[in-house]
A protein has these predicted regions:
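A membrane-topology feature that recognizes alpha-helical transmembrane segments
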Residues: 1-84, 89-181
C-alpha cells in the first residue's frame, strides 16, 4: 500500500468519527457546529488531495467542488424559509468533498434510505424501544423538529466506509488480472 493511500484511509477514519459526533450532537441539541463542519471539509479536501496526487487528475476535486456549490445553492432557499437548519445546509455542502464527486450517487441512495428511516421513526416513535429515545423522539414530533444531520451523517459514514473497504480490497488484491495480461 502506498503512503498516500494510508494517509487517505486515516483521514477517512477520522472523518467517520467526526460524522458520528455530528450525528449525536445534532440528535441531542439540534445544533451542528461550524468547527465540526470546517474540520470535515478540511478532512475531505485532504483526502481528495491525496487521491488527486495518486491518480494524477484533479477532476474528482472539481466535481466535488461543483457538487458542494450546487447543494449549497439548492438548499440555501430552504434555510431562508426556515425549513432546514443552517448546519444541515453546511453539512450537505461539505459532504461532496468528503465523499468525492464520483460517489455522490451512492451517497444519495444511502441518504434516501436513512431519511425514510428517520421519517418512520419520528412519525411512529413506538418503533423504538421504550425509554429515553422514545420520549425524546415524541418530544421532537410535538415540536416539529427533525434532526436532518443524523441521516446525512449516517449516509456519509456508510459511503465513506464503503470507499475505505473498496480501497483496501483493491490495494491488497493479488493482482491476478495483471498477471493474466
Amino acid at each position: 500500500m502506498s503512503l498516500l493511500l494510508v494517509a487517505s484511509l486515516v483521514f477517512k477514519a477520522v472523518a467517520i468519527l467526526l460524522l458520528g459526533r455530528i450525528a449525536w450532537t445534532d440528535f441531542s441539541t439540534q445544533r451542528i457546529s461550524n468547527r465540526d463542519v470546517l474540520l470535515l471539509l478540511c478532512l475531505g479536501l485532504g483526502t481528495l488531495q491525496f487521491q488527486s496526487l495518486q491518480a494524477h487528475s484533479w477532476l474528482e476535486m472539481g466535481i466535488s467542488a461543483f457538487g458542494g456549490l450546487a447543494l449549497f445553492l439548492a438548499l440555501f432557499p430552504f434555510w431562508l424559509l426556515q425549513k432546514i437548519g443552517a448546519g444541515d445546509v453546511k453539512l450537505m455542502s461539505a459532504t461532496p468533498f468528503l465523499i468525492g464527486g464520483s460517489n455522490l450517487a451512492m451517497f444519495s441512495i444511502f441518504l434516501l434510505a436513512f431519511a425514510l428511516a428517520t421519517l418512520a421513526v419520528v412519525k411512529n416513535p413506538f418503533l423504538l424501544p421504550a425509554g429515553m429515545f422514545r420520549h425524546y423522539v415524541q418530544h421532537m414530533d410535538r415540536k416539529g423538529i427533525v434532526p436532518f444531520g443524523v441521516p446525512i451523517s449516517a449516509a456519509a459514514i456508510c459511503a465513506v466506509a464503503l470507499q475505505m473497504y473498496h480501497a483496501i480490497v483493491v490495494a491488497t488484491s493479488s493482482g491476478i488480472l495483471e498477471q493474466l495480461n
